């Protein structure tokens, strides 16, 4: 490579590394109430997109593969969103999160990983227009949601 190209690549890399560090610092400075609001919004949106699929699975609405595929795609993305909002600085904020979510972060993260994996299965089945696969995967998503809420969410 030309010398100027090497310098350009190194400079770009340095900017990216510095930018990543600034991004991490910025997240660490987000106010706890904002993090709680972010995770609550992500959970509410998951419910919004899961609800119509659930209605179809129960027979309360006709099965629509296009709606399932769209909603499952949203769910795949939303399933990854709330977790960076569950940090120790938010433990004193008003929310339904049980203290165990912060005391055993590895176990809590495993529950989050399970939800992400199950929504990925749902998304794959939905994009393949595989109704039987969607039904099976929906059960996995519902179970992952329920078990995490049972363990880490206060009852209303």
Feature-to-residue mapping (PLM):
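Bacterial N-terminal signal peptides
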Residues: 12-21
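Signal peptide-directed secreted proteins
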Residues: 1-4, 156
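Bacterial N-terminal signal peptides that target proteins for export
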Residues: 3-13
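Sequence context surrounding c-type heme c attachment/ligation sites in exported
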Residues: 33-67, 71-156
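Sec/Tat signal peptide C-region and signal peptidase I cleavage site
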Residues: 4, 22-28
């Amino acid at each position: 490579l030309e010398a100027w190209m090497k310098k350009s690549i190194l400079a770009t890399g340095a900017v990216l590394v510095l930018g990543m560090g600034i991004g991490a610092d910025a997240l660490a400075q987000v106010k706890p109430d904002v993090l709680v609001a972010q995770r609550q919004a992500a959970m509410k949106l998951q419910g919004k997109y899961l609800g119509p699929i659930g209605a179809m699975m129960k027979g309360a609405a006709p099965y629509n593969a296009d709606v399932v595929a769209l909603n499952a795609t949203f769910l795949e993305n939303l399933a990854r969103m709330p977790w960076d909002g569950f940090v120790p600085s938010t433990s004193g904020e008003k929310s339904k999160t049980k203290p165990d979510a912060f005391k055993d972060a590895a176990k809590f993260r495993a529950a989050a990983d399970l939800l992400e994996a199950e929504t990925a299965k749902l998304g794959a089945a939905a994009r393949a227009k595989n109704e039987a696969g969607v039904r099976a995967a929906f059960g996995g998503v519902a179970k992952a949601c329920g078990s995490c809420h049972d363990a880490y969410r206060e009852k209303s």
